[in-house]
Amino acid sequence: IIGGVESRPHSRPYMATLEIT
């Protein structure tokens, strides 16, 4: 899941991770 935030750098890293999941 952490990789998701790196793949899609959003305004909110932790939030982006949840969205990627």
From Swiss-Prot:
Keywords: Hydrolase, Protease, Serine protease
Entry GO MF terms: serine-type peptidase activity
Domain Peptidase S1: 1-21
Keyword Protease applies: yes
GO BP, one annotated term: proteolysis
Keyword Hydrolase: yes
EC numbers, comma separated: 3.4.21.-
Region: Disordered, residue numbers: 1-21
Protein family membership: Belongs to the peptidase S1 family. Granzyme subfamily.
Function comment: Thrombin inactivating protease. Displays chymotrypsin-like substrate specificity.
Name of the protein: Mast cell protease 3
